[in-house]
A protein has these predicted regions:
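Charge-dense, helix-prone N-terminal extensions
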Residues: 1-116
Length: 116
């Protein structure tokens, strides 16, 4: 089941201003200051199990965002904006930098007479 845009909007309202999202296969990847910290999967917010996240949410259920993925932590207290802000700020230093996507160059096809 894909996540709804309405739920994504609610999630972004609860997160600090520096939070962004990107649609991916019916779900949403979440970024804090341009680093991936988790995502919205089946209308659930799952975050990476960094030491800070585990420390702040030691009893959080571990769930799979999709088949074949690594376990992530379920963010259950999304309504507490101060907690969410503290969680993301603590996780930030532990998250890897997001790799920039390379733009693919369009190859010319001289054999195709319709190519312009």
């Amino acid at each position: 089941m894909a996540s709804s845009k309405e739920y994504l909007e609610y999630v972004l309202e609860q997160c600090p201003e520096e939070t962004a999202s990107r649609a991916m296969m019916g779900e949403y990847v979440l970024y804090y200051r341009e680093k991936v910290f988790g995502g919205v999967y089946d209308n659930r917010v799952l975050v990476k199990p960094t030491p800070s996240a585990i420390g702040l949410m030691p009893d959080a259920p571990r769930e799979l965002p999709y088949d074949g993925a690594k376990e992530m932590l379920l963010l259950e207290n999304l309504d507490n904006r101060e907690f969410v802000k503290e969680l993301l700020e603590r996780m930030y230093a532990e998250l890897p930098l997001t790799k920039k996507r390379k733009k693919t160059e369009r190859k010319e096809n001289h054999e195709n007479p319709d190519y312009q």
